């Protein structure tokens, strides 16, 4: 394996066949609502961390999840997940993060009873990808958080959130995302060990750690 090969445990490949051309088709509210009734919406969600290992979450005030949640939002046709994550990050925090700074955490499918768009009771079906990036102290100091969909924001120690006795009970999707974010450290160490041709016992110990 090449020394600059992406970590296959923390990488979501993007393939383009032929010459794809982005379009700027705009759907009005009614059309968008009908689209949500018929199709699965792709989302690029974010778990930002700082240089101390703290993780940012937002407390939403709108459906489909009016509670603590990841930042982020939908992808647009033609986006890579890194491009979508960067655009969503700029919108919700004011921070511009280059595509190469984003890393894949996990992905999942989701069904929600309610949604923000009318008719709210029709719900929404989503395919969500969670990405992560570490921001600098300077970036954290200049963040301008979006208040349109969030009532508050908070920084948390991710390891504390997944303890059995954690005070804050997370939605299962968010819990999985935080758990996979914590596991990413082990995945990165495993990838580095394989690239360095580390002893089999060291590699095996890291693999076993992922299954605990």
Describe the role of every protein-language-model region.
Residues 2, 64-66, 140-212:
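Nudix hydrolase/Nudix homology domain
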Residues 2-45, 120-121:
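Acidic, metal-coordinating catalytic segment for phosphate/diphosphate chemistry
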Residues 30-55, 74, 128-134:
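Conserved N-terminal beta-strand and adjoining loop/helix that marks the start
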Residues 39-41, 50, 63, 123-126, ...:
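A generic fold-level signal
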Residues 53, 62, 109:
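Short, glycine/serine-rich, charged loops/turns that create anion-binding
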Residues 68-72:
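A short gly/proline-enriched turn/hairpin at secondary-structure junctions
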Residues 75-171, 207:
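Unchanged
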């Amino acid at each position: 394996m090449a020394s600059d090969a992406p970590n296959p445990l923390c990488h979501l490949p993007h393939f383009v066949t032929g010459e794809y051309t982005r379009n700027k088709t705009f759907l009005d509210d009614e059309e968008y609502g009908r689209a949500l009734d018929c199709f699965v919406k792709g989302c690029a969600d974010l778990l930002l961390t700082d240089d101390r290992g703290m993780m940012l979450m937002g407390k939403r005030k709108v459906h489909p999840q009016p509670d603590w949640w990841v930042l982020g939002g939908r992808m647009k046709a033609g986006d890579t997940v890194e491009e979508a994550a960067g655009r969503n990050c700029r919108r919700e925090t004011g921070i511009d993060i280059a595509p190469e700074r984003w890393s894949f955490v996990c992905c999942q499918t989701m069904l929600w009873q309610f949604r923000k768009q009318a008719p709210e009771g029709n719900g929404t079906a989503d395919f969500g990808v969670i990405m992560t990036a570490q921001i600098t102290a300077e970036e954290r100091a200049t963040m301008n958080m979006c208040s349109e969909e969030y009532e508050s924001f908070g920084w948390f120690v991710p390891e504390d959130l997944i303890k059995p006795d954690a005070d804050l009970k997370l939605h299962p999707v968010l819990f999985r995302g935080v758990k996979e974010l914590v596991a990413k450290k082990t995945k990165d160490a495993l990838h580095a060990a394989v690239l360095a041709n580390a002893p089999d016992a060291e590699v095996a110990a890291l693999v076993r750690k992922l299954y605990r």
